[in-house]
Amino acid sequence: MIRQATTQDLPAIVHVHRVCFANSYSSQLSYYQSVIGGGDLLISFYLEYMKDNPELFVVADDEEKGIVGFCMGYYMDKDDQMQNFLHNNRIKVIWKTMLLMLAGNKPTWNKVLARFKHRPSVSDWVIVNDKYEQILNSQRGDLLSVCVLPDCRGKGYAQDMMEKFLAAMKERGRRLCLLSVETNNLRARRYYERNGVELYRKRGGEGLTYMKLL
């Protein structure tokens, strides 16, 4: 069943995140929260989005396995969730990051080093398709994440979640949805391209942003 997420789903959503993004910096903060203390920052992160845009946070709820996937995003003229998260958790994030670095945690070191290496004075995103540039941010949304547990893929969960997500966005007057993906994530790129997205911009060889007219 595909349904809107609730706060009771957050621990299961974090579990899906940890499995699907096991080597990410965000997962490290979540994995080590019991050792370092301060609560699970991933729960706090997703809660910000769930509170602000509950209709844009959907889950795949399997009868036998429970929550096996989620899809979420935000409206581009109401994109202060990350800012709110950092404002409320900045000290915890810094403290945990420092301890993880001292412990030699590789994903954390990679994140910090990338942050210092890549600090352009202007945006290094290059728009390659401007045919929808007349559509304002007040009519745009962003699909931030769609993921399904590996052993539950191929059953249509991702497709059904994304359709519900895009329908909710369209019902609220959005005309364009953006989504970004790493250039080397060929599986995700093929999936999005099968769903009729168009390339919008590039960031060197690192990332791509697609767009879909609603």
What are these regions, as identified by a protein language model?
Residues 139-141, 168-182:
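Conserved GNAT acetyl-CoA-binding A-motif
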Residues 123-131, 159-160, 183-201:
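Conserved active-site alpha-helix within GNAT-family acetyltransferase domains
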Residues 22-45, 87, 92-93, 99, ...:
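Conserved GNAT-fold acetyl-CoA-binding loop/helix
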Residues 79-140:
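Conserved acyl-donor/pantetheine-binding loop and adjacent beta-alpha core of acyl/acetyltransferases
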Residues 44-59, 77-81, 142:
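A short helix-loop-beta-strand connector motif used in the catalytic cores of GNAT acetyltransferases and
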Residues 1-15, 22-27, 75:
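A short beta-loop-alpha structural element at the N-terminal edge
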Residues 60, 152, 156-164:
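Conserved acetyl-CoA pyrophosphate-binding loop and the N-cap/start of the following alpha-helix
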Residues 59, 66-75, 130, 142-147:
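Conserved beta-strand in the GNAT
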